[in-house]
């Protein structure tokens, strides 16, 4: 008999894994706060901004695939939050439009992974509470002064390109360790789309420099 997701009760694909009830626990290296969930954006403590370390790992079925899914979702949500907070901070209309376009692309990627692996993410991981949002945003854009009307634009592009390249390379690595099949296809497609994001950012960066 086919298994079903305990949250949405949809039938699972034979080769898939349901992440609905999977929770990890992290402990902040600085203040000791414990945090529980499927992912924590940027691995930061929402109380003090310190770095979290894994305190309780997943020990259920198919831990190898679950670890790959968890890492992929974390990369996508990290980029999602980068574009979301960048949109809110910048006063440049062109940069905001570029960040908004990529924000929605990352939103689609998260929805695709959610559909396939049934994470049923806590809405607070996407729409962070105010204090958590401030901590994550300050950490993401550390060293970038958004008060400089044009001074911040190049720095935002450069930081986004570095992060997108890192994400693209990691998705390729994940695809390469998976056997042929739908899981490998998912990560190969995500890698290709992240590469497209790099191209968009590089084009906009070049246009900004040449204007």
Indicate residue ranges for each PLM-predicted region.
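Non-heme di-metal
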Residues: 1-211
